[in-house]
Regions:
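Structural motif detector for alpha-helix initiation sites
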Residues: 97-99, 118, 141
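Conserved pre-ATP/AMP-binding loop-to-beta segment of ANL
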Residues: 87, 105-126, 133
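A hydrophobic alpha-helix adjacent to the NAD(P)-binding/active-site core of NAD(P)-dependent oxidoreductases
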Residues: 52, 85, 116, 147-150
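Helix N-cap/beta->alpha junction signal
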Residues: 16-19, 64-65, 120
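Conserved AMP-binding A3 loop
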Residues: 122-148
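Conserved S/T- and glycine-rich ATP-binding loop of Class I adenylate-forming
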Residues: 12, 30, 61, 121, ...
Length: 150
């Protein structure tokens, strides 16, 4: 994440068709450094990606296979905050998530992880927007802990 310029408080989009290990690994990396995950439905339109990524100020977005890269990249020119789209699957010469996995920033990662507080924002989950634009639901680390403990 740090190699992508992602740091504490930055928003990172995630779009995949199915649950997969890469999603979990990426989501944990996001939370570990104090960044904020923004999962998005794979079935929404480019216009809806544009709306969500602008509202959340998504900096980097990880996408799965198929048309997801194309749909997100259509919105990229209208999302000032979005600097990079990363693929979980090989898709031509597009950036691949494994290109950014390394241990060169371990000390910085550990330092950042120690600063994450339970009341820090962990994720913003968007509703389906059946009566208008999708609405973001902001969840802290404590919200997630409470669900796990119950």
């Amino acid at each position: 994440m740090l190699d992508l310029g992602v740091g504490p408080g930055d928003k990172v989009g995630l779009v995949v068709y199915k649950n997969r290990p890469e999603w979990v690994i990426t989501d944990l990396a996001i939370q570990y450094i104090g960044a904020v995950g923004v999962p998005m439905y794979p079935t929404i339109s480019s216009r809806e990606y544009e709306y969500i990524m602008n509202e959340a100020e998504v900096k980097v977005c990880f996408v799965g296979m198929g048309d997801l890269y194309d749909k997100v990249s259509l919105a990229q020119s209208k999302v000032e905050s979005l600097k990079k789209i990363i693929c979980f699957d090989k898709q031509g010469g597009r950036p691949l998530w494994t290109d950014f996995i390394n241990d060169k920033n371990l000390e910085q990662v550990e330092s950042l992880s120690q600063k994450v507080k339970t009341d820090d924002l962990a994720t913003i989950i968007y509703t389906s927007g059946t009566t208008g634009n999708p609405k973001g639901v902001m969840l802290t680390h404590q919200n997630i802990i409470s669900v796990v403990e119950s």
